[in-house]
Amino acid sequence: MSNQHTLLTSNLLPVGSNISTWWNFGSMLLTCLMLQITTGFFLAIHYTANINLAFSSVIHITRDVPYGWIIQNTHAMGASMFFICIYMHIARGLYYGLYLNKMVWLSGVSLLITLMATAFFGYVLPWGQMSFWAATVITNLLTAIPYLGTVVTTWLWGGFSINDPTLTRFFALHFILPFIIISLSSIHIILLHNEGSNNPLGTNSDTDKIPFHPYHSYKDMLMTTILISILFYILSFTPNLFNDPENFTKANPMITPQHIKPEWYFLFAYGILRSIPNKLGGALALLLSIIILTSAPFTHTSHTRSMMFRPLAQILFWILATAFITITWTATKPVEPPFITISQWTSTLYFSFFMINPMLGLIENKITNTNTNT
């Protein structure tokens, strides 16, 4: 068994010797996924998908179920940690040009969309005030679809408004989608190991590869330990750090919150949606804010893969990162000046990255060729 283990780790999983800590987020995401599925299973045992009982069942879990408060808070906080890791993972991919491994990148974008759908359905389940109104606003965007919008929305709601059938549907979808995420994750990993992982330099690693275990597996274990430590530190001292105060009140369709917003990890897309004063345009912009990631492999023009050697592209990347954070911040604010203007400008900067980066690549190629010729 020992020889088989050595053969597997040495020959099937060789990795470039110079990959950095940024390459540890994949294993951290797998840890988050396992944690979410485990805690989610125990929550599903005690949860009741009924609009009159859902809120009470969540309170019952935290108060009466042994260690229920740990399970519930770990699941809620784990979702935030999951998205922190996945945004870091995507940022690493954009910075180091890992999107050129097209199939891995496209499967990753599919994973992101599935994960966001899963998190959205899960956010509605406690049937708190903000959960209810966020679900109402977001699902109502489907009515912007020409011809089919009203039919699709009515089918999703299970009626003419968000009610008991809607909650049942959302619970069923929230339960089944993680298994689709597992399948997509398996495809993502298989495709990655088919071509092999890249490195920070963006060069071919074939001449300098080392066994994944023990050299990189211990790095993964260290980062996973740090992740779990941070998770349980927040869980112990500030368990409601990312929770909305409105969600501690049971959903009331007769009272609208002053400011409706989804969870923080959707705020960048929600901010882009709000920056466009048109329902269909906003819905398309929201969808495009995620779908535009699929364009990265097809619009790469630079001869250099990694941004490590592209100073102009680095500036553009950090403008994107700043725009992302700023959109998230403005989406937490009321829809009034100056937040509307800031949101519109930062949304423009967000999309500009994917349009300017190809042109910047061509300019860099021109500069490089000129210097080489002289």
Curated annotation (Swiss-Prot):
One GO-annotated biological process of the protein: mitochondrial electron transport, ubiquinol to cytochrome c
Per the record's keyword annotation, is Cell division included, yes or no? no
Q: Which cofactor does it need?
A: heme b
State where a ubiquinone binds: 193
Q: Which residues bind heme b b562?
A: 75, 174
Q: How does it sit in the membrane?
A: Multi-pass membrane protein
- Which keywords does this chain's UniProt record carry? Electron transport, Heme, Iron, Membrane, Metal-binding, Mitochondrion, Mitochondrion inner membrane, Respiratory chain, Transmembrane, Transmembrane helix, Transport, Ubiquinone
Q: Which PANTHER family match?
A: CYTOCHROME B
**Self-association and partners:** The cytochrome bc1 complex contains 3 respiratory subunits (MT-CYB, CYC1 and UQCRFS1), 2 core proteins (UQCRC1 and UQCRC2) and probably 6 low-molecular weight proteins.
Reproduce the miscellaneous comment text: Heme 1 (or BL or b562) is low-potential and absorbs at about 562 nm, and heme 2 (or BH or b566) is high-potential and absorbs at about 566 nm.
> What is the name listed in the Swiss-Prot or TrEMBL entry for this protein?
Cytochrome b
